[in-house]
Amino acid sequence: MTMSINRAYILLFALLCLVGCGGGEAPTPQPTAVLAFPGADGGGKYTTGGRGGVVVHVTTLSDERDKSTGQPIQGSLRKAVQMEGTRTVVFDVSGTINLNSQLDIASGNLTIAGQTAPGDGICIAGYPVVVKASNVIIRFLRFRMGDQNKVEGDALSINDRKNIIVDHCSFSWSTDECVSCYGNTDFTLQYCFITESLRKSVHVKGNHGYGGIWGGTNASFHHNLLAHHDSRNPRFDHSYVNNKCFGPVDYVNNVVYNWGGNSTYGGEGYDQARKINMINNYYKYGPATSKKTRLVDPTVSCSYCSDGHTLIPGKFWLAGNYMYGSTDVTNDNWKGSTVTTDAVKASARWTEGLTMLSSEQTAEQAYETVLSKAGCSLSRDVIDTRIVGEVREGKYTYNGSNGSTKGLIDSPSDVGGYPTLNAGTAPTDTDRDGMPDEWEDANGLDKYASADGKIYTLDKNYTNLEVYLNGLVQNLF
């Protein structure tokens, strides 16, 4: 009897330690954890986001603040993302949210489910969006920043965070990079469109039409489209931004079209080589491309970024990349590199510490998948539809208004500005649990009891709310 009591106390103590020893951020999910959603892949695929938390409805496109309190108004996206606690954000409205200032996502344990918006979905415009928290899932949104407020910035930036996955989003019209994600751990950017950064706009340095800076540790970038950028398609981790994240990075099954002066480059690190896999990507030159067979330009020297440290070139594993118009580079990817010394060549694919992709395709297969299914594709707007056509045809439609040409633009007005998004009508959700009444009725749930969204009636791995959210877009992988 005494032995049984002692064992019980030991077990209770162990359980209390497991519960009470965590920090402020959500713990890193273990490899046996459930996928963030079916189709999630790569380093961030076990992100839990807002699973099991409260549901927050976005009911207005306004970004105004309450005049008496100075706080974001109820029902706004800003109010939803600035709340604390585990939560899932759903949308009862569609259209363009014109931000009045930079939007910071400073509290994690968050899922933003853009696929719930009725009509044509959501576009976020006017200012940068910056993720300053960990354990975040972002899906099916458009980030089209623009130049109307004369600010420098990325449409979306995520730096030095953990457990994040960004899926099926569209980014464009930034005045710096379209989307920069570096220094992150357990991270995925997948099935996104990154297009038409503004080349000669408001950036203090002048020409700055860049795709993105990407990197991290156990970081995956797959099935994305980069199109119509002058450079950084992408750039792998600046050496000075984070000297703790040296990879490995998986850059797999991406499509790059119409790069201008530079395609993919970078990779250098402080005192240690960064580890980068470039596998089965599809490169297609366009009218603005100056070096049509350049696959990658590994950085081996940098006068402004060593900061007193020894600069070490990145170690690249190149395999299966397809260079449109060049059989030589397609057959031997190193023929598309500006540097071919052993200093930049990995002897084998980097795998240690990396969550391997389960959805790898050949470059040619990925080309079709990305163009048909990536981006904010539940309801593609005219911008993404046009760009897909340009990639397929190897053409461009617009020049810039400040001297940029051949698909590289300088302002959203060069392409006709922001399209009007159909508002649609949100389905009735009586108990405000994020699941429409009609869907709850069809699945044997109670449309008058909000608690049933948090439980696992329909699937042992996903809450009932997640089953609904996942089902909306299950055909887009």
For each feature predicted by the language model, list its residue ranges.
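Bacterial N-terminal signal peptides
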Residues: I10-V19
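Bacterial Sec-dependent N-terminal signal peptides
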Residues: L18-T32
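Acidic Gly/Asp/Thr-rich repetitive segments characteristic of extracellular carbohydrate-active
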Residues: L35-V89
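Extracellular beta-strand-rich solenoid/capping regions of secreted or surface-exposed proteins
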Residues: I73-G85, I97-T111, G121-R139, M145-K162, ...
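Right-handed parallel beta-helix
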Residues: N109, G114, S134-M145, D160-W173, ...
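Extracellular beta-strand/beta-solenoid scaffold signature
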Residues: I124-V129, N149-S157, W173-C181, V202-G216, ...
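Extracellular beta-rich repeat passengers
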Residues: R235, C245-P412
